[in-house]
A protein has these predicted regions:
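Flexible, acidic/histidine-containing loops and adjacent segments that form or flank the divalent-metal
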Residues: 1-101, 179-180, 189-206
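Short, structured coil/loop segments at alpha-helix boundaries
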Residues: 18-21, 135-137, 157-161
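Active-site-proximal loop/helix segments of hydrolase catalytic cores
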Residues: 75-156
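C-terminal regulatory/interaction regions
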Residues: 108, 156-206
Length: 206
């Protein structure tokens, strides 16, 4: 049988696969109901911009155009585990017409090149503003950057890191020792060519 392997590994692997596959299946269902096209990406060690469409650009990944055939069942199980390493998180930028860039950092430490933005852009803080990703704030430069972070807890000593707190324009969905807010809203002002803060919560973490 192809399932001949260490029992603990097999049980843990199946549990992890089941958990992750259910997440993927749910996302796929929601996408199909909305008529969205589903695409698969794989991480790339090289930092290069790959234009996708609809204004999205991938910064550290490439679109999978050909599915690789796996040799055996165990290779299939290993492939399904999906990496837990945050460095493999995919980073995307979105821009359309004259709207400045919105950068989605996920949990990535994407710092292979230093970038300076001259326009008023929005960047999501990588890994909820974790100290493990603190070097990102040195590699992404600009005077008008708006940093936004989400979190599901507000008593984590490692986030947000001091580098996030030191940013001039920073916003939190969950500030330390303060209540959660449901959303942070910005609206693009075409006249002044900038993002206007509408509602939410400025960072009050200390």
């Amino acid at each position: 049988m192809c399932f001949y392997y260490k029992k603990d590994f097999f049980e843990k692997t199946l549990h992890y696969i089941d958990f992750k596959l259910n997440k993927i299946i749910e996302i796929a269902k929601l996408a199909l109901r909305k008529g969205c096209i589903i695409r698969w990406f794989e991480p790339s060690s090289a930092c290069s911009k790959n234009i996708i469409e609809y204004g999205f650009v991938s910064l550290n990944s490439g679109k999978i155009v050909k599915i690789k055939k796996l040799k055996n069942c165990m290779a299939f199980l290993h492939a399904l585990q999906l990496t837990k390493e945050n460095k493999h998180s995919l980073v995307f930028e979105y821009t359309k017409n004259d709207i400045p860039i919105i950068r989605f950092s996920a949990d990535s430490n994407c710092t292979c090149q230093s970038v300076t933005y001259n326009e008023n852009i929005i960047v999501t803080a990588p890994h909820h503003g974790s100290s493990a990703n603190a070097n990102v704030y040195k590699s992404i430069k600009g005077d008008n950057i708006i940093w936004v972070r989400s979190d599901n807890e507000y008593k984590n000593n490692k986030r947000p890191c001091q580098e996030f707190k030191d940013r001039m324009n920073n916003y939190c969905l969950a500030c330390c020792k303060y209540n959660f807010v449901s959303e942070i809203c910005f609206e693009y002002n075409t006249w002044h060519k900038q993002w206007d803060y509408i509602s939410g919560q400025r960072c009050r973490c200390k």
